Amino acid sequence: MLFRSVVEFQAASLPDKLTGTVMAVPAEDGLLLSDQPGQYYKTSYKLAAELLTAVPVVAYDLKELASRFLRRNLPVKFVASYDVGHAGFLMGSLSKPRTLADILAELSDQSEPRQLATVYQLWQQTRRQLNQLPQLAQLASRVDFPLQPVLARMEERGVLADRAQLTRLHQKLGDGLALLEQAIRREVGYEFNVASPAQLSEALFTKLALKPTARKNKRGSYPTGAKELAKLRSAHPVIDLIIKYRELAKLKTGYADTLPKLIAPDGRIHTTFSQSITATGRLSSSNPNMQNIPARTEQGREIKRAFIAPAGRVLVNADYAQFELRLAAALAGDQALIRVFDDPTNDVHTMTAAEAYGITPAEVTPEQRRHAKVINFGILYGMSPHGLAEATDMNLSEAREFIDKYFQARRSIRDYQAKVIEQAKEDGYVQTLLGQIGRAHV
């Protein structure tokens, strides 16, 4: 909620040099700059690029401001000082991202002075709130705010795409889908639209008389989602064909068909990065989502191969090993788990299985290790016995017993989770190691 503006802005002549922190607000035909409350200067982006050299800048959206310079082939020389919109997100005051245009659209007066006054008062308001949370303020000033122009450069640069590879994959997936459709229809015994959930339901539960695993939906058909099909795998060979068909269809429509249309004239795909979409502040991307390119299947890996490096360069892929588990061990002070990670010869999932089943690591079977891997990652996100049973071949009783044994071996993690929940109830929010706030719903 905006409070009544206490600063009125008036246009002034542009000085030769700006001093102190500069507030920058995009205008229809230029940029509004203010280095002191009450007055502002209107200038072109070209001149602003020179005036803002090594100057701390406040903006409602630092990434968008940097992008405006980059789109005009101008250098980004300013120091990212304060991002008003992102500050609101960091403190959990924004349930969803709001652009400056969203806020200004609610105002009856949208003049340039009013736009400046709005950004100024939001800056002052959020800065006071942020300063009450020193750890979060440090995260913002050292990491999040300086990252915004970097993200703008990443978006502007984009990633090189191999159009020929995507064209080949488009054809290959289309051929594969056609063959699978024929095989599915042969198994069922008549022609129908495999992509139609209603027609597929009719084929499985009426024609083949398979036993439904769930009640009928509102449209009067038995559901044929991934969960339901997984439960039917042993009932008929057509189920595996349908699962494979859907995997290929998702790859084709979601990537092979879509990505070529997103290749810009420079031969690159330019995604949009955001720090204010996920509740945790984890970086996300959209149009397209470059962080969710599938790689578990060979066809998925073929999509990844369409992203290439320019001549003389290479793409480097790096990933943390069991990052969430390592954080959990440190946060909970689980010394046994920390010792497992300290020894690079240890396998954390094998060690967990050994502790849960009361056997030596050498006695752990591949199936027991798989169970431990599922629970190691799932338990951090509240996996229930029902969820564990669905993710493995355990029944509900076995899953419940395994979780009990897990927490006997990992009491510190159970105690830490309980402590966090109680703290969230008391404070109304949870906080990460670096101070990121998440409003609690408990």
Where are these regions (language model features)?
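Conserved small/polar residues in nucleotide/adenosyl-binding loops
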Residues: 2, 440-442
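Conserved RNase H-like, two-metal-ion catalytic cores of nucleic-acid enzymes
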Residues: 1-106, 174, 329
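Conserved "right-hand" nucleotidyltransferase catalytic core of DNA-directed polymerases
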Residues: 1-44, 56-57, 115-295, 308, ...
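Helical catalytic core of nucleic-acid polymerases
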Residues: 65-134, 144-157, 197-198, 216-218, ...
